[in-house]
């Protein structure tokens, strides 16, 4: 199928649901899914966003703004994720444990509204990556219509652009827990530090960024085409000074640049 045939198929899949609650993070995939569902089902669609310390405030703000602009009903559920010691210990299946907890809360939040289905934004590319969280999606019988329609991330961006969505060129985001080495305990204060460090780099004009934490070392990942900018003495000194203030002893640049799931690389070797 070509792109627009896939899009038509997606709309037919959604139409068959009758009504739908969409787990909405504000990212590229869930925004496109939510908009498409709203175009098909109208007020029989509702967005539900989980609020938790793994998600930066800027992501929540953008999710709220999106729903307000599109006039889509939007509710929230609060997830005290670090109350789970199993998740805080950051095992290799953390993503599964976390997703399971989030989906439990989302289902509880949606229950009073009598929606037949809940959908989430996994796409056809996600099966290529280490995604233990998808096991929880399957176990909770959550729908993944983008994946079912065979839409890739690049195709979702293209269709989002055609629909005029502000998220079409939004950089990919992963929860802040992914900045920790597996086995290193996730601490709320460190999440705040990482969020501030990444926001600082965003404010300097860097696009796709991650600040990974290795004890007292900050490992910065950015797109390689921005290396020339970050190694300028005035920029590198400013970054070093700011991250030192945040509590890091050493600040490093990953020479491979940004890549999805770099903390998973050692796991995938096994």
Where do the language-model regions lie?
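A short, acidic, flexible beta-alpha connecting loop/helix-capping segment that sits on the rim
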Residues: 254-261
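A short interface-forming secondary-structure element
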Residues: 213-215, 219-232
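A broad detector of the eukaryotic-type serine/threonine protein kinase catalytic domain
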Residues: 19, 95, 181, 223-225
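Mid-to-C-terminal catalytic subdomains of enzymes
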Residues: 118, 147-153, 157-201, 207-209
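ATP-dependent adenylation/nucleotidyltransferase module used to activate substrates
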Residues: 1-162, 203, 218, 234-248, ...
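Short, low-order "capping/linker" segments at domain edges
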Residues: 261-270
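C-terminal boundary motif of the adenylate-forming
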Residues: 207-214, 254
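Generic alpha-helical secondary structure
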Residues: 103, 187-194, 232-236
